[in-house]
Amino acid sequence: METNNNLSTQLFKCYFCDILKLKMHKMSCIHLLYLVLCFLTLTHSAAAGPETLCGAELVDTLQFVCGDRGFYFSKPTGYGSNNRRSHHRGIVDECCFQSCDFRRLEMYCAPAKQAKSARSVRTQRHTDMPKAQKEVHPKNTSRGNTGSRGFRM
């Protein structure tokens, strides 16, 4: 009886090993498939290089790249090291009609704002801003004085 029990145990172990090997083989194939897909995706995106960005996609990308600094659609005069370009060219010319990369996008970001103390902001607010003057519009006297009488035409 003990030999019969050993035989069934060995058969179970062998059957279990076969199932485990089959599952391992399937899992390896799935992992290999994922690895190949990842490789192809990365290779394709690396080969693509700079992209063209237009419209809302360009604005969203600039907001992401520049963050709280904000951005310009055209470079300020004298901004950047390449002065041979016309100052009329803007981000749309460079990134929508042609391809541009991250560094090109970053050139259109506004400079970082420097933190000011609360006192300097308060002082600046009172000294730098002129008082709003009321606009005085003269009365229209071209029709003449009609008094309280209403004229019909």
From Swiss-Prot:
InterPro entries: IGF-I, Insulin-like, Insulin-like_growth_factor, Insulin-like_sf, Insulin_CS, Insulin_family. Pfam families: Insulin. One of its GO terms (molecular function) is hormone activity. One of its GO terms (biological process) is head morphogenesis. Its main location: secreted. Residues 119-153 are annotated as: Disordered. SMART domains: IlGF. CDD domains: IlGF. This is Insulin-like growth factor 1.S. It comes from Xenopus laevis (African clawed frog).
